[in-house]
């Protein structure tokens, strides 16, 4: 009498299971990590959106992109080892700085200068290398400072 139950798969089922496992390994070469808490910003100030790869990996040859929602124009694009301002939304041109000093370790940031109230909301930090890609969702909360009137 056998003490442990054994699973037996047909040859085609075993091959399919192996292929699915390999596909999962290929597509999960890295994940993108961003802050879990909302990023707080004030109108007129600068704010920094940070994200990084896990495990740590050189991203110099990857595409890195920030955008507001899926399929929307980009807030910022880094591709082919350089910034691609021609793909950037007009309202962000000249107002962003790509911080890439740690890109060889998979860590990047985007500084948005002179934040406006309309920039409140969700941002996505997206990395792609070949067919592998992932994104982190960041939440930006923009507040306006109100000046108290003195009588």
What are these model-predicted stretches?
Residues 19-33, 67-72, 132, 138-151:
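Flexible inter-domain hinge/linker segments at boundaries of tandem extracellular adhesion modules
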């Amino acid at each position: 009498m056998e003490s442990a139950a054994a699973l037996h798969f047909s040859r085609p089922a075993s091959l399919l299971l192996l292929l699915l496992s390999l596909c999962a390994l290929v597509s999960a070469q890295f994940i993108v990590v961003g802050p879990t808490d909302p990023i707080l910003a004030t109108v007129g100030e600068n704010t920094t959106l940070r994200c990084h790869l896990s495990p740590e990996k050189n991203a110099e040859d990857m595409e890195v992109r920030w955008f507001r929602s899926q399929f929307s124009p980009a807030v910022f694009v880094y591709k082919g080892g350089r910034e691609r301002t021609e793909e950037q939304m007009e309202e962000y041109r000249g107002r962003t700085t790509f911080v890439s000093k740690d890109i060889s370790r998979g860590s990047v940031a985007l500084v948005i200068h002179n934040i406006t109230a309309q920039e409140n909301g969700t941002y996505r930090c997206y990395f792609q290398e070949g067919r592998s890609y992932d994104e982190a969702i960041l939440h930006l909360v923009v507040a306006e400072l109100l000046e108290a009137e003195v009588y």
